[in-house]
């Protein structure tokens, strides 16, 4: 789904306040600490709580492999100038219906600053720039208004409600489904360009020092 450009671990995206990069094995402790919080994990389908230490390294390995194979693009969210300090994740992969789907999580210390929206917009922009896909989907639990607001601010349109299996939660839960197409994204960019990707990868692939 993704081209050769994104399949190298020097690939990153820059926004006004964030650097998005491939996850590294050094991110394991941050993932365990932040993703493992109940407030974060309970809104996701696959993040366990508590988060087993060995699961973090496995997640990083599998994520990097999927990125390298072009099957997905999942990036660590870091603050600009602090690229070694993971604060969350954002990624796009195909769901069970083989549709490209975006997902994200942010550690609770970073809530309330608009980082999730900023990161999601950057990855959405890259998705439409670097792939030939015309639509992107997402789902959120009905009890997660914060995630719904992120999707709405990214231009997603509500498609309806349904049920979805949350393996890590051990059951099926009500969700709201959203969809964004290429035309709607182009319209959003036309009046909100400052929130999109500011600079795409450079040839040297270097990240600034932390």
Where do the model's predicted regions map?
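Short, well-ordered strand-loop elements centered on a beta-strand within folded domains, enriched
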Residues: 64-65, 102
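Short loop/turn motifs at secondary-structure junctions and domain boundaries
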Residues: 65-71
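Acyl-donor (CoA/ACP) binding surface of acyl/acetyltransferases
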Residues: 1-41, 74-210
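Conserved GNAT-fold acetyl-CoA-binding loop/helix
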Residues: 39-62, 73-75
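A generic secondary-structure signal
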Residues: 62-63, 126
């Amino acid at each position: 789904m993704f081209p050769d450009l994104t399949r190298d671990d020097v690939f990153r995206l820059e926004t006004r306040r964030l650097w998005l990069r491939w996850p590294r094995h050094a991110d394991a402790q941050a993932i365990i600490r932040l993703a493992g919080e109940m407030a974060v994990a309970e809104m996701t389908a696959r993040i366990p709580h508590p988060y087993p230490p060995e699961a973090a390294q496995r997640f990083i390995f599998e994520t990097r492999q999927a990125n390298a194979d072009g099957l997905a693009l999942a990036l660590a969210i870091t603050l600009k100038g602090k690229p070694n300090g993971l604060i969350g994740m954002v990624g796009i992969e195909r769901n069970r219906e083989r549709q490209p789907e975006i997902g994200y999580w942010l550690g609770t210390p970073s809530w309330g600053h608009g980082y999730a929206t900023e990161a999601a917009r950057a990855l959405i922009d890259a998705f439409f720039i670097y792939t030939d896909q015309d639509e992107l989907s997402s789902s959120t639990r009905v009890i997660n208004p914060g995630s719904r607001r992120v999707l709405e601010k990214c231009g997603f349109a509500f498609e309806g409600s349904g049920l979805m299996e949350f393996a890590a939660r051990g059951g099926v839960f009500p969700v709201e489904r959203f969809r964004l197409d290429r035309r709607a994204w182009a319209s959003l960019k036309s009046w909100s360009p400052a929130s999109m990707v500011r600079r795409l990868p450079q040839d040297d692939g270097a990240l600034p020092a932390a």
